[in-house]
Amino acid sequence: NNTFGSYNTLKNNVEFGTGLMGEKFAFDGRLSQITSDGYMDRASSDLKSFYLSVGYFGKTEILKAVMFSGHECTYQAWYGVPLNYLESNRTYNPYDYENEVDNYGQTHYQLHYSKKANENTNVNISGHYTHGEGYYEQFKGGEDLADYGLENILIGNDTITESNLIRRKWLNNDFGGFTFSLNHKMEKLNLT
């Protein structure tokens, strides 16, 4: 599946699904990518993702493993166009540093198990883990060196206390856990 759009926007998808094989197993997957130059100056984007799952479907139980991930690299265009540019330059972007980007990826892992104990009762257990990592990079003009843990620079009798900098802030995060449910149906009441 391919789609083309304004501002050199391109979306590509490839997906597959086996359906139930041998009355017990199924595999599904998808790859996606979106790229665009963006409407605003230097507001490009490059987005990639995938999804994979494998499942076992028994008579009284289901076991399914899922993994999906995405990565994005986008040029910054957070601020709107100033009023004085609306008539003459509607695509104006105040960010002019060539690598003013947000670059981040995140991957999710999940394992799901469901067991039908009897006609009225089933148990569900799921585990999940997510890892994310990335940064944003930006130009910062006239920054105090001390704010970055840097010492002043002495050149002859002159002391330099501020400078233009390229700043990159990183994020590296992990999250995981488990969920559990027991469902029981009675004549006039459902318990979870």
Features from the language model and the residues they span:
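A short alpha-helix capping/helix-coil boundary motif
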Residues: 28-32, 88-91, 157-160
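Flexible loop and strand-edge segments within Gram-negative outer membrane beta-barrel domains
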Residues: 36, 41, 60-109, 132-139, ...
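Short hydrophobic/aromatic-rich motifs at helix boundaries and adjacent loops
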Residues: 20-25, 81-85, 149-154
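Short, intrinsically disordered/low-complexity patches at protein termini
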Residues: 49-52, 64, 86-89, 146-148
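Transmembrane beta-barrel wall of Gram-negative outer-membrane proteins
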Residues: 4-35, 40-75, 104, 109-121
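Face-selective signature of the C-terminal outer-membrane beta-barrel domain
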Residues: 104-192
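Outer-membrane beta-barrel proteins
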Residues: 2-4, 38-42, 53-55, 93-101, ...
